[in-house]
């Protein structure tokens, strides 16, 4: 029941983020211009490079707290959060100077038009405050995770998104539109989210109290040592996820990176959805590990890969299959020429993102060294390929996209299931089974998209939405009849009858 509630809340938050992106992007592009819009994401990417330092703590505190609390070791769990809070304050103070320096020297790192330089610098300064606030509050995310009430996190994220959008509209209406106003709006949303996170932390974990006697170098060292490989991994993640816009800016110019920033939002939303849904399976997998139930962990992990893949296959197929008409209707005919980029993104994301729930297995086992090294190496491969293919090979934005596709498939679809099978002691192919159903469903949905376009001209929002609904219905029937197990079909029918009975009442 909790999984259903958590899943529904996460799906609602994702749909809200899609709606807000579709609605806000054309507005911001038209208001600020394509070049300026590119710097909205680029400035945040620059700030996120500092997460290499902060992730050493933030990536492990939730896991350490949850395992200790599930085992009844409340004193130990209390100490983990207390040490995290103290260490995060100290690290934040140390980061103030380099964050400020990145703002003032940004024009030496990337191509920034002189007319936008002051705006970009102020945007980075405000974004730095947002970054530090998010880091400080990360420890309070342990409460919903420990209680397996992740719908609380999704609800807070939804509120944060709404506050951000409303703040952007208000600032643009009251002042001359600038890039920094978007960061200020994001900061306003983060402040509200922080207040809510703290409230629910105290409500879900009333036994926690910050005590000076819990602060110890030994506990902090334990967190840092466990998170050290997370920092190495984060370097690789940044080389995967947040180097493409910088590469486009340096190799192809501000205009090309602005266009790429507009369309890259949807692949990023798919990644976000995959990560969010994968996290829903993490509490149960952590619980299986804590109890030493490896058979249960293996079965649940395979189910997680298949369900995560099924959820991603539909939006990915819609994104790739309807890329041309979608970009034309959404941003104008000038963007339709880069529609194949979305098709490439959709194709490799279906294959690679389905395996993300498996990340939480090596986190539970505290076996992060090898994944971190592999992520770092393949992240470097991604950068080399992106620069080579976009520049010397003259493939432009397509080179950057292909580089990401090759690197991410190698990391997620090949290395991840093989490594997880090794640390759990199972055969190499065990964790590859879950991808077959989602992949076949994605191909089916993409085929339906193309078939409809041969019959009907899609040139307006109503026709695009109608096509999306039709494809979704066909996909649901295909997945229900051919991909879901007999037990899952019975469960769906049982809940449908229960819902129908409640409505009739």
Curated annotation (Swiss-Prot):
Keywords: Cell membrane, Exopolysaccharide synthesis, Membrane, Transmembrane, Transmembrane helix. One of its GO terms (cellular component) is plasma membrane. InterPro entries: Poly_Biosynth_Transport, Polysacc_synth. It is a multi-pass membrane protein. It comes from the Bacteria. It is found in: Cell membrane. Disulfide bonds: none annotated. The keyword Cell membrane applies. The keyword Transmembrane helix applies. This is Uncharacterized membrane protein EpsK. Induction: Repressed by SinR. The gene is epsK. CDD domains: MATE_like. It comes from Bacillus subtilis (strain 168). May be involved in the production of the exopolysaccharide (EPS) component of the extracellular matrix during biofilm formation. EPS is responsible for the adhesion of chains of cells into bundles. The chain crosses the membrane at residues 9-29, 49-69, 86-106, 122-142, 156-176, 181-201, 235-255, 261-281, 310-330, 341-361, 371-391, 395-415, 435-455, 464-484.
